[in-house]
């Protein structure tokens, strides 16, 4: 839908950082189509899909996982919880809860001949955004500042932002969604693995979670395959080794978030005098935050 070659980071009306890179630092997709593509590919690979109403209970029976739903019990060797920030699997199998949940409102604004670049607008809640697609913009506002004292944003805040930026109140398909960002210390227990937002693996700087969701899902699956292929290999240990590296990365993002949202004026000048270009170039070249900061790839091994 769109490759973000040009990006704007706005700290105020007068303080804006404009960055660009030919490769583009991120690619915009239609989420429904993105999810549908991977779902269809998964089914093609042999996965069986079953729609259920509600999971009532998840239990460990010896070395198996028992899942009770719709009056039935399903037994499996491993359970992967990929059910988002409000994960039922997480709630039924662990004491891991989000202390300061972050969330966002997002809607669609028609382009109508305009051509806004990808833009992040930082504010007292976290940031608002404009993400261009082919025929519309994804426009949203999120409370990325994870604090019990921070004010909850509302749909009214989104309407105010759209009105100020586009001079119109016309915004369609408004949705509200949570973002799982508190998995800095998450470790898999037994043979139940959480991935993506269910494990709190979205980064806390900008709230991006798709990359880590795909990556953690990939490693959870491959760790199970490796354990089936080698009796001496523990899927849990392999997945937790991956999580150790990934959560170190998340902790680095959290440090960055504290600087960005706690000291916006300093952040502006840091980005203006070199750090912004360093990040733009690094992300456009597919580097992690650790690699951008000069460290080796956390997934090199």
Regions found by a protein language model. Name each.
Residues 57, 147-224, 228-229:
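FAD/FMN-dependent oxidoreductases across multiple families
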Residues 64, 73, 127, 136-138, ...:
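Structural motif
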Residues 85-152:
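Conserved FAD-binding catalytic core of PHBH/FMO-like flavoproteins
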Residues 49-51, 100-104, 166-177, 237:
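A short coil-to-beta-strand element that immediately follows conserved catalytic motifs
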Residues 2-92, 98-102:
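Conserved N-terminal helical subregion
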């Amino acid at each position: 839908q769109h490759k973000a070659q040009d990006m704007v980071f706005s700290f105020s009306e007068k303080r804006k950082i404009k960055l660009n890179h030919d490769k583009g630092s991120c690619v915009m997709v239609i989420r429904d189509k993105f999810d549908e593509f991977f779902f269809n590919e998964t089914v093609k690979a042999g996965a069986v899909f079953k729609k259920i109403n509600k999971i009532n209970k998840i239990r460990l029976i010896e070395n198996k996982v028992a899942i009770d739903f719709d009056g039935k019990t399903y037994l499996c060797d491993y359970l992967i919880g990929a059910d988002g920030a409000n994960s039922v699997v997480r709630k039924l199998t662990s004491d891991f809860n989000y202390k300061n949940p972050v969330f966002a409102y997002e809607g669609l604004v028609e382009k109508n001949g305009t051509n806004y670049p990808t833009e992040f607008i930082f504010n007292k809640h976290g940031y608002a955004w404009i993400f261009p697609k082919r025929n519309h913009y994804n426009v949203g506002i999120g409370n990325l500042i994870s604090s019990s004292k921070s004010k909850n944003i509302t749909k009214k805040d989104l309407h105010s932002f759209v009105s100020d930026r586009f001079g119109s109140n016309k915004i369609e398909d408004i949705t509200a969604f949570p973002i799982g960002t508190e998995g800095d210390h998450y470790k898999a227990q037994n043979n139940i693995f959480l991935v993506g937002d269910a494990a709190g693996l979205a980064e806390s700087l900008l709230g991006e979670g798709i990359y880590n969701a795909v990556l953690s899902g990939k490693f959870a699956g491959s760790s199970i395959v490796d354990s089936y292929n080698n009796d001496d290999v523990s899927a849990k240990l392999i997945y937790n080794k991956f999580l150790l590296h990934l959560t170190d990365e998340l902790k680095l993002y959290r440090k960055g978030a504290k600087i960005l949202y706690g000291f916006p004026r300093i952040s502006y000048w840091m980005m203006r005098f070199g750090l912004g270009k360093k990040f733009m170039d690094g992300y456009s070249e597919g580097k992690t935050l650790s690699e951008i900061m000069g460290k080796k790839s956390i997934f090199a091994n």
